Structure formats: C-alpha cells, structure tokens
C-alpha cells in the first residue's frame, strides 16, 4: 500500500487526519478570530472540501475561558498547556484528495488570501497522522 493511502476493510477503517495548530493574527481578538473562522472561512471552505472527498473537518477553539478549565485536569504527568488559538482537523482517505483541493483555482483565489486575514501563518504548525478510534458514541470499539 502506498504511503498516504487509507487502509480500508469493513473491520479496519483508517483515515488520515491533518491537524493544523493555529495562532491568530497579531492584534486580533479571540472572538474576532473565532468569528472569522466560523462565519467567514468555514462557509467558503466546506463545500470545496466535500467536492474533493474530505470526510470530516472540525475546528477546536482554544480560548481563554476554555484554557482556564485545564486547571481542573492538570496532574503531575500532564501539566503543560498548549498555547495555540485553534486546532483545525481535516480527515480524508487519501492525501491526494487534499492536494487536489489546494490546486483548485477557487481555493487559490479565495482561500489562500483568506488565511492571511485571521491566521499567523508564520507561527502556526501542522502535522498528519492516522486516526485509530477506541470509543465511538460512548461505546468501546
């Protein structure tokens, strides 16, 4: 099997997940950042993702109010707080699907420029890996 291809069978379904650990643009408030991502970028992006076979796309907004909740979860092993403003996760079968989406003329014209409106693209980071589920809808799998 080629690297970047998901492994499929009825009992073993694995997808790739691109995780973008994002920082907001300098000087932008948390609320303005979240608003732009949810109400401007997402509506422009989601149909294009569907067109290219993206299975799932989520945003996790890591604002001061939710970061404060971490004090209730820290323990001696887990005590370092990630300072990213958002985690955006894109799930797909094949890395080629995502690459084709990024080559779409509409993506190049509208979305590449949009990232500069809200994101600190110099500090934000990415990683990719296989998803392996152990609990789904409250049930062990």
UniProtKB/Swiss-Prot annotation:
Enzyme class name: lyase
Boundaries of every EthD domain copy: 26-121
Catalytic activity as recorded in UniProt: atrochrysone carboxylate + H(+) = atrochrysone + CO2
Keywords: Lyase
Family membership: Belongs to the tpcK family.
Family matches, as InterPro entries: Dimeric_a/b-barrel, EthD_dom
EC number: 4.1.1.-
UniProt key word Transport: no
Name this polypeptide is given: Decarboxylase CPUR_05434
Disulfide feature: none
GO molecular function terms attached to this record: lyase activity; oxidoreductase activity
Induction or repression: Expression correlates with the formation of the sclerotia and thus the pigment production and is directly regulated by the cluster-specific activator CPUR_05433.
Highest taxon listed in the record's lineage: Eukaryota
Function: Decarboxylase; part of the ergochrome gene cluster responsible for the typical purple-black color of the ergot sclerotia. The ergochrome gene cluster produces several ergot pigments including the yellow ergochrome secalonic acid and its derivatives, as well as the red anthraquinones endocrocin and clavorubin. The pathway begins with the synthesis of atrochrysone thioester by the polyketide synthase (PKS) CPUR_05437. The atrochrysone carboxyl ACP thioesterase CPUR_05436 then breaks the thioester bond and releases the atrochrysone carboxylic acid from CPUR_05437.
Alphabetical list of Pfam families matching this protein: EthD
Keyword Lyase: yes
């Amino acid at each position: 099997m080629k690297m970047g291809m998901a492994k499929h069978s009825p009992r073993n379904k694995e997808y790739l997940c691109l995780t973008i650990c994002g920082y907001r643009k300098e000087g932008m408030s948390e609320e303005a950042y979240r608003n732009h991502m949810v109400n401007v970028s997402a509506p422009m992006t989601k149909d294009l993702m569907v067109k290219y076979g993206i299975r799932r796309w989520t945003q996790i907004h890591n604002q001061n109010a939710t970061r404060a909740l971490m004090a209730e979860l820290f323990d001696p092993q887990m005590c370092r707080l990630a300072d990213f403003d958002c985690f955006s996760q894109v799930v797909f079968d094949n890395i080629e699907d995502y690459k084709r989406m990024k080559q779409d003329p509409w993506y190049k014209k509208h979305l590449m420029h949009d990232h500069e409106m809200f994101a600190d693209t110099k500090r934000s980071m990415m990683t990719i890996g296989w998803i392996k589920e152990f609990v789904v809808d409250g049930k062990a799998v």
